[in-house]
Amino acid sequence: MRVKHKPWAKDRLEEFPAIYIKNPEDFKGQWQEVFGNNNPIHIEIGSGKGQFISGMAKANPEINYIGIEMIESVLVSALDKAIEADVPNLRLVARDAKLLEECFEKGEVAQIYLNFSDPWPKKRHTKRRLTNPTFLTIYERLLPKAGEIHFKTDNRSLFEYSLVAFSEYNMLLTFVSLDLHNSDYEGNIKTEYEEKFSAKGFPIYRLEAKFDRN
């Protein structure tokens, strides 16, 4: 989907340094100082307009959340939701997922969320998918031994691709649902895309996985 460019987005984000972290590389290994506590850190890669990450931060004050979205014109919408949520455990970062190791130390992130990521359907774009082994290698370094990846999508092809990619990477699949909203899963917080697609009758796919390090 084409994103409308907002030339004022960067300046708007920088008006709120308590929420928007302009230079996340400066805090690699020191995110506890940013939040002022030792609570676990969960990140959402591709946080879009921020409904999910703001909802999670509000529902779980004992966890620190960082929403990561590389497009500032999109992230500025997440900023508005963060301001409205008015929670101390949420920060926003504008970075490409390929650069995450520049922002976080090994094992510094307790959990990763991938919600409605771009499916990149063309074969030549496979490596751009956030569940591609190239990215799994990055996630493995960021997560501790017990760390998990939680993935949601409405795209069955991407979900099937991800199941195979995770399995071939020798990850342990701890939860799989082919119709999340009609399952027994509790505590789901919807994204904007999730509300849109589920309202049209599309099933939502979800999986949870962790790296097998035994």
UniProtKB/Swiss-Prot annotation:
Highest taxon of the lineage: Bacteria
UniProt-listed Enzyme Commission number(s): 2.1.1.33
Pathway: tRNA modification; N(7)-methylguanine-tRNA biosynthesis
Known catalytic reactions: guanosine(46) in tRNA + S-adenosyl-L-methionine = N(7)-methylguanosine(46) in tRNA + S-adenosyl-L-homocysteine
Active site annotation, chain numbering: 118
One of the record's GO molecular function terms: tRNA (guanine(46)-N7)-methyltransferase activity
List of residues binding S-adenosyl-L-methionine: 44, 69, 96, 118
InterPro entries noted in UniProt: SAM-dependent_MTases_sf, tRNA_(Gua-N-7)_MeTrfase_Trmb, tRNA_methyltr_TrmB_bact
Positions that bind substrate: 122, 154, 191-194
One matching Pfam family: Methyltransf_4
Role, per record: Catalyzes the formation of N(7)-methylguanine at position 46 (m7G46) in tRNA.
HAMAP family in alphabetical order: tRNA_methyltr_TrmB
Family according to the record: Belongs to the class I-like SAM-binding methyltransferase superfamily. TrmB family.
Record-given protein name: tRNA (guanine-N(7)-)-methyltransferase
Taxonomic source organism: Listeria monocytogenes serotype 4a (strain HCC23)
Gene this protein is translated from: trmB
